[in-house]
Amino acid sequence: MNRTWIRWAWLGTLGWAVSFWAQAQQVNIICSVQAEWCSMLSTVYARTTGVKVNMAMKGSGEALAQLIAERDNPKTDVWFGGTGDPHLQAAELGLSLAYQSPALPQLHAWAQQQAQQSGYKTVGIYSGPLGFGYNPELLAKKKLPVPKTWADLLKPDYKGEIQVANPASSGTAYTMIATLVQLMGEDQAYEYLKKLHKNISTYTRSGTGPIKAVARGETSVSISFVHDGPGEKAQGFPIETITPADGTGAEIGSMSIVKGSRNLAAAKQFYEWALTPSAQALGAATLQFQLPSHKETKVDPRVPDFKKIKLINYDYAKYGQTAERKRLIQRWEKEVNSLPQ
């Protein structure tokens, strides 16, 4: 835990917190960003407000499944982070509460759009592009080139050298499928995924698992959000990232208040705090380098430069629909995951 950053965030949010000090005593949060970020959010918020934070860490697919299971008796107040598609699905299913923050005009257009297309049942809190992580030491040792396009990943040389998450549990992997469908067309995308399957060593439960495996020399290449790479590198691991030259998608990490929250005042207070620049800066403090949604948040130089990335016009509304997500994942299970490796 970075004590300097905690002190900074404490000072930055103290004035905001005082007005709410005695109003809310507990908030229950599902956190779908990396563990270090979740932990710092919990610590800083509790110290600045005196509110008890009960935080569970789950991937976005698992988080959505939990909210569905608890819909008649919600035990969660806020869902923080994770890819935006399942947040849109939660909105569609009536699992999240419509709420318009006064801070909305201060957010980037993509974050506001996420709120608008959900009926204000979610909001964008960060964005990050999909790409590849690779271990330069392993690639050199195995005499493998750096993959630069989606097509490169199909080369026989990469057999058993690639990890990606399982789309049934990971929003990262679902973003990959939705990106490929939009980039190639659906049938061609699934033919691609069948060929890619031959080179996959493991489908992990978590979207961050593959890039951590790359950093630790357990695999050569991952399909990951590239903002997860610099944090591993800052810890001394040999890892680099690249976005495919033929185009890629980006996530809009989101935040939602759960409909039926037992601690609604506390949920709204945490929601407002999480949109402030000082709270959003906690991501970089824990070596997470997504692009923050608040325009005034200081952007770390290690955050990917979106201007240098070939991004597709990702249809967040369509691929955030429950039926579309279910259909695409079921097709992947039937046509891809069932194949031998």
Where are these regions (language model features)?
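Early extracytoplasmic/lumenal segment of secretory-pathway proteins
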Residues: 25-89
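A ligand-binding cleft/hinge motif common to bilobed small-molecule-binding domains
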Residues: 85-89, 215, 220-238
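Periplasmic-binding protein-like
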Residues: 128, 192-197, 203-204, 235-259, ...
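Mature extracytoplasmic/periplasmic domains
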Residues: 258-316
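Conserved C-terminal helix/tail region of periplasmic/extracytoplasmic solute-binding proteins
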Residues: 314-341
